[in-house]
């Protein structure tokens, strides 16, 4: 049966007990309102560890002004049931005072230069500082051997990998594959913001990503690929933040079209901001 913990000393006692037994511990950080994509991360983590801790904490420092912190969906009972079914051993539920004992205004920030300053970093200034700050705190609280993050937040995963390497966290970072609905929409906690009319339109993001991949693969210039993608999304009713092709480290590719690339999209449909990506 899954254990639920709200006290840091109890969490550390549990994890330390596991480690004394020689068990590997994994962490799956979340903000709750969990779906199949989150549960797939628990199952991925289980392949690399003997015990899995998932955290649920809606982190105020990664939300910008006029974003959805206050109304971010919270579904604690369903989350607990789903985590238990997925094989999670412990649920860590810190409150704001535990996570930020000096208050958010005095929290020591962590910034990952370069990778956190482009794309989402330009659209949501300070977002990744909040992500790095809370993830580093979760790492210190749980002391995991392994941590799993979803590839849907491709840039977030890259930012966390950079932070872990630079700050020498002794933690293996796993990237979990994107889990999609039948029509291709990437699963996201924010999908429930979509209206009944918007929901079928939202699947166009994945269709456009596939078009970007196929067009780029036959040698279409990158600028032309990106312009066509933005136009297709706008025609479908989106307001586009970006639709780009990048190298895996999120730098801009040169003239060659060989090697690994990733197409990334962020766009708004009504009041809902959606992000997705496709590696190729």
From Swiss-Prot:
Compartment(s) where it occurs, according to its Swiss-Prot or TrEMBL record: Cytoplasm
One Gene Ontology term of the molecular function aspect: ATP binding
Reaction(s) catalysed (UniProt annotation): (R)-pantoate + beta-alanine + ATP = (R)-pantothenate + AMP + diphosphate + H(+)
Catalytic EC class: ligase
Keywords carried by this UniProt record: ATP-binding, Cytoplasm, Ligase, Nucleotide-binding, Pantothenate biosynthesis
Pfam families: Pantoate_ligase
Any one GO cellular component localisation term in the record: cytosol
Binding site for beta-alanine: 62
Entry binding sites for (R)-pantoate: 62, 156
Active site: 38 (proton donor)
InterPro entries: Pantoate_ligase, Pantoate_ligase_C, Rossmann-like_a/b/a_fold
Gene Ontology BP, a term: pantothenate biosynthetic process
Function: Catalyzes the condensation of pantoate with beta-alanine in an ATP-dependent reaction via a pantoyl-adenylate intermediate.
PANTHER family per the UniProt record, alphabetical: CYTIDYLATE KINASE/PANTOATE-BETA-ALANINE LIGASE, PANTOATE--BETA-ALANINE LIGASE
Additional facts recorded: The reaction proceeds by a bi uni uni bi ping pong mechanism.
NCBIfam families attached to this UniProt entry: panC
Family: Belongs to the pantothenate synthetase family.
Cited HAMAP family: PanC (MF_00158)
Protein known as: Pantothenate synthetase
Organism of this sequence: Xanthomonas oryzae pv. oryzae (strain KACC10331 / KXO85)
This protein's encoding gene: panC
């Amino acid at each position: 049966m899954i254990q639920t913990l709200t006290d840091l000393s109890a969490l550390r006692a549990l994890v330390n007990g596991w480690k004394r037994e020689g068990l590997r511990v994994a962490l799956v950080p979340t903000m709750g309102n969990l779906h199949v994509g989150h549960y797939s991360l628990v199952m991925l983590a289980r392949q690399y560890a003997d015990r899995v801790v998932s955290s649920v904490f809606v982190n105020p420092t990664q939300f910008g002004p006029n974003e959805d912190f206050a109304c971010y969906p919270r579904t604690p009972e369903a989350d607990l049931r789903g985590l238990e079914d997925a094989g999670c051993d412990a649920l860590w539920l810190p409150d704001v005072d535990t996570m930020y004992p000096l208050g958010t205004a005095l929290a020591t920030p962590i910034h990952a230069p370069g990778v956190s300053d482009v794309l989402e970093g330009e659209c949501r200034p300070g977002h990744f500082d909040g992500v790095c700050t809370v993830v580093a705190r979760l790492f210190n609280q749980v002391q995991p051997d392994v941590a799993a993050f979803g590839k849907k937040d491709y840039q977030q995963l890259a930012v966390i990998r950079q932070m872990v390497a630079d700050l020498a966290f002794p933690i293996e970072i796993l990237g979990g594959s994107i889990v999609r609905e039948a029509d291709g929409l990437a699963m996201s906690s924010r999908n429930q913001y979509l209206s009944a009319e918007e929901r079928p339109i939202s699947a166009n993001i994945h269709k456009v990503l596939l078009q970007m991949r196929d067009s780029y693969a036959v040698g279409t210039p990158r600028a032309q690929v990106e312009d066509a993608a933005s136009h297709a999304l706008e025609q479908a009713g989106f307001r586009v933040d970006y639709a780009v092709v990048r190298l895996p480290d999120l730098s801009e590719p040169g003239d060659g079209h060989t090697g690994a690339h990733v197409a990334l999209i962020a766009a708004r449909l009504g009041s809902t901001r959606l992000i997705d990506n496709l590696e190729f």
